[in-house]
Design a protein with these regions (language model features):
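Extracytoplasmic low-complexity/disordered linkers and repeat tracts associated with LysM-containing
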Residues: 1-145
Length: 145
């Protein structure tokens, strides 16, 4: 089902773990603050993208945590609905990580599967800290129709 294995909880009151497909601009929009506010709050380098698995501190001055979570969930559900409108998971395989392999490399170059989908199939793996030898379940997708 859409949204299954999607953990968007707020940690420690004002922090989240960045999910695949999210940008600083998304968080700023959902919170109704400027991206620069989040850059300062998190002591980030300007114009450097945030990473999947990274903890990000949030500013709830203009939006409640519940409203933020609703917006974030709607964004992710939209991505999944669009994807599953055109593709289905036909099978899975196990991939043992080799030195130098990253989620991005597996997602974009090796298997052509969205990073968020790999994350859904590996809920107990910290995809932000992958090391050689870790075994990932990779969903194999096919176009519908």
């Amino acid at each position: 089902r859409i949204g299954d294995n999607l953990d968007l909880t707020i940690l420690e009151g004002d922090r989240v773990i960045v999910e695949a497909g999210e940008t600083l601009g998304h968080f700023a929009d959902w919170l109704q603050v400027s991206p620069q506010r989040l850059v300062r709050l998190n002591k980030l380098r300007p114009r450097r993208p945030i990473q999947v698995g990274q903890k990000l501190r949030l500013d709830f001055a203009k939006v409640t945590p519940d409203a933020f979570l609703q917006r974030r969930l709607e964004y992710h559900k939209g991505i999944e609905e669009d994807f599953f409108g055109s593709f289905r998971v036909a099978n899975t395989l196990e991939h043992k990580l080799k030195p130098g392999e990253t989620l991005w490399l597996l997602s974009h170059k090796k298997y052509a599967v969205p990073g968020w989908l790999i994350r859904r199939y590996n809920p107990d793996v910290d995809l932000g800290k992958l090391v050689p030898g870790v075994v990932l379940v990779i969903p194999i997708v096919e176009k519908i129709g």
